[in-house]
């Protein structure tokens, strides 16, 4: 869905890419919908991995509606990992967050910093999702995963076609 974005992003992507990206509007918490979508793409033989950016992202809102964040952020990741296993997909790029570091002891923070208690439900969901992915890797060593821990991404594509949504 476009709860954190807007369909107009697709117009900007089309201008940059020179062709329209294919869109599958899917509730990532719906296992049946995920299976149908991955099956449809896999039948074409052109799926090599998954980029998982489907999550609620407002720290403040997460303190007001923590259950909503747990259900969506953790639920969608668990559902996706399950679907990936059923379809033999082994590569995942996960959009995590610097919030997994909690209140770090040292600044600047790098990848070797310890994971400390999260300061928000949003941060906690990212910690849990990272753990789910790491546990999936432990049980299936063929899984390749990258956990992207963003700080404050800002700016737009040089064309200004994408990158300025809140």
What positions do the PLM features span?
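Generic recognition of short, well-ordered alpha-helical segments
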Residues: 8, 36, 61-64, 75
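N-terminal Rossmann-like NAD(P) cofactor-binding module of classical short-chain dehydrogenase/reductase
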Residues: 48-51, 93
């Amino acid at each position: 869905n476009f709860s954190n974005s807007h369909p107009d992003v697709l117009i900007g992507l089309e201008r940059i890419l020179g062709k329209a990206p294919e869109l599958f509007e899917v509730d990532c918490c719906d296992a049946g919908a995920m299976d149908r979508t991955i099956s449809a793409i896999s039948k074409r033989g052109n799926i090599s991995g998954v980029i998982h950016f489907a999550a609620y992202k407002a720290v403040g809102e997460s303190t007001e509606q923590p259950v909503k964040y747990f259900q969506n952020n953790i639920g969608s990741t668990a559902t996706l990992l399950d679907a990936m296993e059923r379809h033999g997909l082994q590569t995942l790029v996960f959009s995590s967050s610097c919030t997994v570091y909690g209140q770090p002891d040292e600044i600047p923070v790098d990848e070797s910093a310890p994971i400390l208690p999260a300061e928000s439900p949003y941060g906690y969901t990212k910690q849990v999702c990272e753990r789910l992915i790491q546990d999936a890797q432990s049980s299936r060593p063929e899984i390749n995963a990258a956990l992207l821990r963003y700080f404050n991404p800002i700016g737009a594509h040089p064309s200004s076609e994408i990158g300025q949504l809140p």
